[in-house]
């Protein structure tokens, strides 16, 4: 039986293709983040099925316009349930969006055209419609836990059509 040849990727040779997640420097690791801020949205888990539901409610530290944390360096101290992504947990966190750079690299997949490491432009994540910019309706300080169910949305778990393109639209 003949082995199926490995598909050649135009990204072969880049650090995320040549290093394991554990071998990456801190700067390389951080650069895998595309800046979408979808992971900073509040999520609910169905206790029976384990299914994750995203909301359009942001963490109290999320700047929804910049798609960045107001206090990234101290986020874990200020938000005790903030999940720090690590090489170990990105392989098992089921709620990471399908577009997440950490998830894609952990799965051995290529980054999308709009990822800043590919495009060279941190704004392409917004241009592609992947980020939360303009979609965060409130922060967790404005919505009670009991009311989060009323804020469930499906878009964070989906990839926008233009983000699926092979290259930046014309």
From Swiss-Prot:
Pfam family, one: CxxCxxCC
Domain of life: Bacteria
Sequence similarity: Belongs to the UPF0260 family.
Record-given protein name: UPF0260 protein RPB_3505
Source species of the chain: Rhodopseudomonas palustris (strain HaA2)
């Amino acid at each position: 039986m003949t082995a199926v040849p490995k598909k050649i990727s135009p990204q072969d040779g880049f650090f995320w293709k040549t290093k394991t997640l554990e071998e990456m420097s801190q700067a390389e690791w951080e650069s895998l983040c595309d800046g979408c801020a979808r992971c900073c949205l509040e999520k609910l888990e169905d206790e029976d099925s384990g299914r994750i539901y995203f909301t359009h409610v942001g963490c109290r530290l999320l700047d929804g316009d910049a798609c960045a944390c107001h206090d990234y360096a101290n986020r874990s101290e200020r938000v005790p349930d903030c999940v720090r992504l690590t090489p170990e947990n990105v392989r098992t966190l089921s709620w990471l969006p399908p577009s997440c750079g950490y998830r894609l690299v952990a799965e051995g997949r290529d980054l999308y055209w709009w990822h800043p490491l590919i495009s060279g432009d941190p704004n392409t994540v917004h241009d592609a419609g992947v980020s939360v910019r303009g979609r965060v309706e409130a922060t967790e300080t404005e919505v009670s836990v009991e009311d989060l169910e009323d804020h469930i949305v499906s878009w964070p778990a989906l990839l926008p059509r233009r983000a699926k393109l092979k290259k930046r639209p014309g």
